[in-house]
Structures are given as C-alpha cells and as structure tokens.
Amino acid sequence: MLAQAPRAVEAIALPAPSPWGSLVIDTGRCTMCLACVGACPEAALADNPDKPQLRFTEKNCVQCGLCAGTCPEQAITLQPRLWLADGGKARKQMRVLNEAEPYRCIRCNAPFGTLRAIETMVGRLAGHAMFQGKAAERLKMCGDCRVIDIHTDPDEVKVTDL
C-alpha cells in the first residue's frame, strides 16, 4: 500500500486513544530512573545493561500510558501515530530516547545510577533528618559500599536490646 501512495509520508498522526504510537521524552525532566521500563507490559521500553540509556521499539508500543503514569518526573508524553519511515521498517528498530552520564560511587568508583538521578535524590532528601552528614554521603555510594560503610562506621547507631 505504501508503494502505491502518490507521495511518501513519514508518519500519520492518529487520534488518542490509538493502539500505535511513539513516546516523547522531556530529557530536561527525565532522571533515567527507568521506572517506565518496569511498567511497560509490551517491552516497548528497555534499558541498556552497558550504559544509562532508555531505548524504545515503536512497533511494541500499544499506547497504554502505564509508562507515563509511572514516571515520577512526568517526563513522558504519548504520541499516537503510525510511523511509516523506511517503509514501516523503522518502527521495528530499537532507538535511544534518552541517555545520561553514569554516576560513580564515591567510595569504589563503580558506575551506578545516573548523575541526574543521584543529584535529584540528594536534593530531595537534603532537608530530611535521616539523611544528614554521613547518611547523606551514603546516598552517593553504590549498594555494596553503602552496606560496608554502615557496618564499619563506629559512630553508626546500633540496634541493641532494651
């Protein structure tokens, strides 16, 4: 049918709700927490195990909106459309919607999370009584170093029998 069209069309906008479409990520808001990846029932969204990336395969997206509803930063907008680029083959290709600089543990230098996610978390918890001093610094450590730091700190509060 595409071959018979009088002119090539890259995409056809569709009304919502539609079973086809893309996502628009506000990269200024997205912290790359990847909550959307876990929420996607069709595996349209995926992470990259090698580096902080949010990847998307449009043919898998059913525009259910679970990703947008799960996003704590409200950085996802559904874009109902039928993408016809490259004869419709582009819809089947995984593409990167967002990527970020990895954050490195302040103790062992291992990458974990993203710079933006850690900065956002530290900022949100800055006024919380449980995240002051050494506890605030632990937010900048990977999970392993956080546990080691708590158990090797002589000043850490210990649970004892009363």
Residue ranges of model-derived segments:
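Ferredoxin-type iron-sulfur electron-transfer modules and their immediate structural context
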Residues: M1-Q53, N60, T70, Q74-A126, ...
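C-terminal accessory/interaction regions of large nucleic acid-associated machines
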Residues: L139, V157-L162
